[in-house]
Amino acid sequence: MSNLRIVCQHCPSVVFNNKRPDVVKRPTMSAMLHSETQEDLETDDFFLLKDPFAFDNVSVSKPLANNYKLLACADCEKGPLGYYDSKNNEYLLLCSLEKN
């Protein structure tokens, strides 16, 4: 299995450079922030991480709606790069950040 390297879109910092994680479908960031329920939400593809130490360089926001936290670059503080779902202990990094 190859490595996945994600570089911040706003600065040269490497956010993730590790073994390629599984891809999962989860609610989009917009959907999960604006919905009271988790039923029939629009989904997006995310890289699923369970360990925050798998990241090279990420910051986590204060809790938002439904106890979700946004992920951002720890150097420039820009994002969001994905979100943390505290209920399921999942760090979800947007697949769209991968450069082919």
Curated annotation (Swiss-Prot):
Q: Which GO terms describe its biological process?
A: post-Golgi vesicle-mediated transport; protein transport; small GTPase-mediated signal transduction
Q: Which InterPro entries match?
A: Mss4, Mss4-like_sf, Mss4/transl-control_tumour
Q: Which residues form the MSS4 domain?
A: 1-100
Q: Supply one GO molecular-function term.
A: guanyl-nucleotide exchange factor activity
Q: Which CDD domains match?
A: RabGEF
Electron transport found in the keyword field: no
Keywords annotated in UniProt: Guanine-nucleotide releasing factor, Metal-binding, Protein transport, Transport, Zinc
Positions of Zn(2+) binding = C8, C11, C73, C76
Question: PROSITE patterns from the xrefs?
Answer: MSS4
Source species, domain of life: Eukaryota
Membrane-spanning residues: none
Pfam entry (one):
Mss4
Its GO CC terms are: cytosol; membrane
Signal peptide, first to last residue: none
**Family assignment from sequence similarity:** Belongs to the DSS4/MSS4 family.
User: Per its database record, what is this protein's job?
Assistant: Guanine-nucleotide-releasing protein that acts on members of the sec4/ypt1/rab subfamily.
This protein is called: Guanine nucleotide exchange factor MSS4 homolog
Q: Name the species this protein comes from.
A: Schizosaccharomyces pombe (strain 972 / ATCC 24843) (Fission yeast)
